[in-house]
């Protein structure tokens, strides 16, 4: 008779809930065996559910595949709201019907999984472009226009160039057909891929800035207006990476000029 450990190792090879192997093993009344059967069935169901979720996030891409298009780029940005640091956009072309387990809107991915999924996107993508627009340009042209500039910069880095753009709630002045999707990072795998690339890229930049400008907690808050960040602003003042067109940074700068 096989040991429970041997059965556990064997069950990993079972890929279907309807497998006759389950029926056979269910005759074994050892509680440990029954526990492993239930555990494996849950794992198979979770894999099926994940596959369905990923399939549903390819609906926009599949419509474009039907039109004969394959070089479809997802575009997203991170960093429109922070008080400090750049806005970062990413453009990602995935292979046709590519599915990356766990890929989702970066806000829905557990932080501990960010680097793993970022690496999976890097490994599988046909091309990746990254656009970074700093705080000085943001202050000059406004955050909306700066976001568009970051997206255009990211697209310009792609090789091959895309046949169609899938963009998260934006439209770009480019001679390429495009689809603007509300909550695109939750509804398109291509945009979700861009979302995690932009997120990890910007987070790493803000960790570097945290070394240059200690006291604002940039490594943790990524430039957003948390209590620690605001405390740093009050005690230490404005850094060269702060957005002086954003409040309360703007008032701090004006107050300093007036005093």
From Swiss-Prot:
Domain of life (superkingdom): Bacteria
Details of cofactor binding: Manganese or magnesium. Binds 1 divalent metal ion per monomer in the absence of substrate. May bind a second metal ion after substrate binding.
Subcellular location: Cytoplasm
Entry keyword annotation includes Manganese: yes
Annotated Pfam families: RNase_HII
Cofactors: Mn(2+); Mg(2+)
InterPro entries: RNase_HII, RNase_HII/HIII, RNase_HII/HIII_dom, RNaseH-like_sf, RNaseH_sf
Function field: Endonuclease that specifically degrades the RNA of RNA-DNA hybrids.
Alphabetical list of PANTHER family matching this protein: RIBONUCLEASE H2 SUBUNIT A (PTHR10954), RIBONUCLEASE HII (PTHR10954:SF18)
Protein name: Ribonuclease HII
Species in which this protein is naturally found: Streptococcus pneumoniae (strain ATCC 700669 / Spain 23F-1)
Gene (UniProt): rnhB
